[in-house]
Amino acid sequence: MRPRGAAFAAGPPGDLHLGTAIGFAGAIWRSRSPAMSTLLDIKSSVLRQVQVCPSFRRRTEQDPGSASADPQEPATGAWKPGDGVEFFAHMRLMLKKGEGRQGLPCLEVPLRSGSPAPPEPVDPSLGLRALAPEEVEMLYEEALYTVLYRAGTMGPDQVDDEEALLSYLQQVFGTSLEEHTEAIERVRKAKAPTYALKVSVMRAKNLLAKDPNGFSDPYCMLGILPASDATREPRAQKEQRFGFRKGSKRGGPLPAKCIQVTEVKSSTLNPVWKEHFLFEIEDVSTDQLHLDIWDHDDDVSLVEACRKLNEVIGLKGMGRYFKQIVKSARANGTAGPTEDHTDDFLGCLNIPVREVPVAGVDRWFKLEPRSSASRVQGHCHLVLKLITTQRDTAMSQRGRSGFLSHLLLLSHLLRLEHSAEEPNSSSWRGELSTPAATILCLHGAQSNLSPLQLAVLHWQVSSRHHQTCTLDYSYLLGLLEDMQAHWEEAPSLPQEQEESLADSLSAFSEFGLQLLRQLRDYFPATNSTAVHRLELLLKCLGKLQLFQPSFEICPFESELNMDIAAALKRGNREWYDRILNDKSPREQPGPQRLPGLVVLADAVYDDLQFCYSVYASLFHSILNVDVFTLTFRQLERLVAEEAWVLTEELSPKMTLEVASGLFELYLTLADLQRFWDSIPGRDSRSLALAGIHAPFLPAVKLWFQVLRDQAKWRLQGAVDMDTLEPVDASSRHSSSAATAGLCLSHIQELWVRLAWPDPAQAQGLGTQLGQDVCEATLFYTELLRKKVDTQPGAAGEAVSEALCVVLNNVELVRKAAGQALKGLAWPEGATGPEGVLPRPLLSCTQALDDDLQREAHTVTAHLTSKMVGDIRKYVQHISLSPDSIQNDEAVAPLMKYLDEKLALLNASLVKGNLSRVLEALWELLLQAILQALGANRDVSADFYSRFHFTLEALVSFFHAEGQGLPLESLRDGSYKRLKEELRLHKCSTRECIEQFYLDKLKQRTLEQNRFGRLSVRCHYEAAEQRLAVEVLHAADLLPLDANGLSDPFVIVELGPPHLFPLVRSQRTQVKTRTLHPVYDELFYFSVPAEACRRRAACVLFTVMDHDWLSTNDFAGEAALGLGGVTGVARPQVGGGARAGQPVTLHLCRPRAQVRSALRRLEGRTSKEAQEFVKKLKELEKCMEADP
């Protein structure tokens, strides 16, 4: 490989700080809620809104009682014992540092500076050598000669004013007017250049078909018409165009200076030739290029004749000779010797040489007819360029090629144009002034430089100039792309020019590698301008790698990527050593080096973040270089070496200060490992940091012990300073709760960030940390209780406000502690399911929640106890209200009282606590109404209707359209009991009796096998209108006699009595000394089917124990609804006395619900109610207590 350029002389700019974007962590939970509305309409008595929305957010500002401002740098000294504020301030800084290290960084840097990029190094010695005065004079003469002897047509973006161009040259070469005039005179006296026209016949399209097969066999004849022939007989030319054909009657022979012929393309109307010709020009202003396109015939040897004509081109009378050849060739054809053969002509072109643009022309020309009788169509694609073949200049005479002359002229003009525009700017894109561009275009054309050579020259000059005075990389990239495009079209250069290009590419690649070596200095990731410049530089290097000529003259394909990797590695090591020597010199003792090593590790992490989010995608997409892996591996290994050595040195000297530094250092090293693991396909077990946690374990344990003590001291100080008042208008808790929640949140976040990798060790650390959290939380609630107990005016209203704050504090800390404990889940790979707490910690967590819930309920009971007397007073007001007033008027005082009280509580309590208070008040109200109902007997139905209205109004009030308690909880428990009481109190006596039997039917399925079983069979005989009830047998009855047996018999009766008023009860025989009697007795009851279909209609079986000496004992009962009996619900099938299937009934004893119906009937004064109650009480005398 060729040596790469000169040495990189300029030094780097000053060290640039790669800042770390650190987010703010920690916010105190606040509780916000819409205020509860006041009672706007007493009649509606519905509370519209009681919801509050507490939230637990960490404050971005400092927590109460902390220092006035957080320190900007991590504290390096040990904190004072008992100073929890300083300890947690230090911990907050560690958490802030880790906030930006969660997962993979974004693939772009959100905060980038738009300031100018750092200046790149320049070295004037890397440019082209300065010209000697004599060489400058020759270059000046070369430029003047180019302007004075220009030829062709100037383009619209070029300067056509000769004086303007000469004046520009005088200015850029810095000559006086006298010197300038003398130079012009010398050049004018020089011999004019020899001009030539380069013609490339590329292709034609849409030609006319001349052959029977629908195609033609086209070929071109072209030549230069000299001035003598082109200007004579203008009248004849006006009638017809010149053509290379046989003579006609219209004029004499038309000589051609040189006639060239292309190949014949058979059977096509769109021929492609791509043939090139060079014609000498005598007079640029008058000579013309003429081109004919003919259809070739097999029997005509015109092409051969033309080729023979070119061999004698020096003879006089060439035109007549050409005419003779045409005649001879045509004579052998089918046409006569005097015919025009117009069918063979396909079109012609006449192009004055003076109309050829200076830069050449590459376009399609429309074919023209030679006379009005000709019929042509189609276009011909030509490339024309006017050049000079001999130049009378000093450079030409000394053998300087046009390539070298143009290089010197371009370099001179580019340097002067740049210095005139923006001498110190790196954004200049090589925009030359119009005179400069015109002169370079003229010189390039006259020197016969190909587009590839011009592109190579522009690249060589600009890339060299860039190393002396920085240019815009987009300009250089454009030059490389232009050069590559032209190389693909014509990949050939003289050997000397190829070698010159190779040196240029090699020098630029070396320059780029030196910049990449100092990547962080010249292209900082936080500077958008610098990153964009880096992208363009990489594209330039990538273009060198993919540039076809570089494969032949510079072996970049196999070496450039390795060179880039080597430059990046060397730059990484230099950057690392610079920070290490500045922050943590190896000459210092371990404890003094530790803070600096923390800074170094943080700098490495931040650098790798920038590398991943900014540099990696650029290098990979453009050069296919994995810069992130390369950088990570190298820096991670260097940091790991320092960490292993330092921990081994500091382990025997473990102090609080050392533990703090090691703990912070480990967090960053663990972040590095997680960073690598978070990338798909990467495994940190292969890193040098693998297993680094082991030597840090003693420091972590010591730090956790200090954390426990510091948390208690911090909470003690917060409670001491607390006034038990909300911290602001938007909060419902006091300052100590905010501090406690923040501390617990920090502990949980710290554990998450620690993510200790060893499962067994993590179990022990997590369990201990969780116990510390529980202990600190209970410690705080105990401090609160002592605080509120010592508040003055314990019996006054102020205590209620303080209790509300305490209740809110307990709720906030309960949630904070629960959230913190949830974060102490098992690490991946530990025993047990992921996310499950260890059993001791889970037990501690449940115990903590129970204690805090109990504490909250105690405070809630204390708050609501002050409202019990008032609630009873307002309920009594409802019960004593006369029937003459409306229900809403009777309820209004209670609703107004509740609205006022709950509005005050809503303003003071968070949602969870307000719900707890609402539930307590709801239960108080239900019990008060139940007591009022029990205290009032023999009252009107309006009394119960009023309380029914009150109950529904309270449900709406406490539900508050979904903003209060849910309907499911409101309509449960005591509400159901009260609702049933009100319903039954509103019922008639017979409805109450029916409810009594319905309750019996419901209770038969609640208890099984406790009091035995009874098998019966029932059916209804429609023909006789009677009900047949057959008692079959019983089993597992209760032993009611001293001998362990019973003498059971069964009483069979129909109920309710008012449905079957004429039916008497019947009984079976007594079966002595048995618990499994068999009866097989059939009883008939003459009753109508309609009565049996009533909802409460049933057969009641009562099993009694016969006692000869005293009252019979009650053994159990069972009820069977008649609605499902065969013959009642559906017609009897099969007939017979024993139709239907046996039914097994489980015996039971009346439950409280059934007995309550009896108590409701006791208050009735009607005869029917009293007789029914008397009968039931006689039965109760026979009952014993439930076993």
Swiss-Prot record:
Cofactor or coenzyme needed: Ca(2+)
Task: Kindly give the Pfam families that the UniProt entry links to this protein.
Answer: C2 (PF00168), MUN (PF06292)
Which GO molecular-function terms appear in the entry? calcium ion binding; phospholipid binding; SNARE binding; syntaxin binding
The record, for InterPro entries, names: C2_dom (IPR000008), C2_domain_sf (IPR035892), MUN_dom (IPR010439), Munc13_1 (IPR014770), Munc13_dom-2 (IPR014772), UNC-13_domain (IPR052095)
- MHD2 domain mapped to chain residues: 888-996
Q: Which residues bind Ca(2+) 2?
A: 1041, 1047, 1105, 1107
Membrane-related topology note = Peripheral membrane protein
* Binding residues for Ca(2+) 1: 211, 217, 295, 297
Residues forming the C2 domain are 176-335, 1010-1136
MHD1 domain boundaries:
663-784
| Gene Ontology biological process terms, A to Z | dense core granule maturation; exocytosis; G protein-coupled receptor signaling pathway; positive regulation of insulin secretion involved in cellular response to glucose stimulus; positive regulation of neurotransmitter secretion; regulation of behavior; regulation of dense core granule exocytosis; regulation of synaptic transmission, GABAergic
| UniProt keyword terms in alphabetical order | Calcium, Cell membrane, Cytoplasm, Endosome, Exocytosis, Golgi apparatus, Membrane, Metal-binding, Repeat, Transport
- Give the UniProt family note: Belongs to the unc-13 family.
Name this protein carries in UniProt: BAI1-associated protein 3
Organism, per UniProt?
Homo sapiens (Human)
Name of the gene encoding the protein in the UniProt record: BAIAP3
